[in-house]
């Protein structure tokens, strides 16, 4: 009987160890921290893209001397709290119940962006909030703040960017919480009012411990670090190049490679020896 108990105990211990090892292996190929970070990142990049679009159309992009004109959306109603050229000025963009337009995405609800000065002027702060705002069925909440920090060493305008209390509620009812601290460099397109030639490079915020942190749809906390600047072209929905490191709590750091500059929704996720392709939502 004693021998049987010992053997049973050994077998049980071995089985537990084996199952634990299998569970750990499965968990370490989990894509949701990377995918959900991309959803949140894309949501708040798109939020800024819409603000930039409407700012350009209404003369907020540069020196407020001219407007660019309608580029895509016919359905949002855009109003201002003060006459053009006066600050602070809150731009309210109302998409109503449904508006398919800029970059082909369906939006509803309201975006509010308060400018303390022209977009391209050093010292300007832009604070963006939402009211019952949805993109392709996902509800976007939170506050995004951009501060125009003037020119960097390369002579390009750059912005410090913060997202506070970001919350994405997916169509399934699952949620992603997200906060971010970034630096956004305006690399190309500053000299024109056209949006499609604007290119931004996004890196970790100056002095920040990480680029973003959040909790994915499965309740797992994660942080991110931008290993190579994420390049955002304003005529493309997705990040076109750059490398992002994502570290879920208690798990191996993943590397998300956004590609070679092509405008597509593909990214390569690497976790140790495991590699897979993921499809970016936007």
At which residue positions do the language-model features occur?
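Bacterial N-terminal signal peptides that target proteins for export
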Residues: 1-10
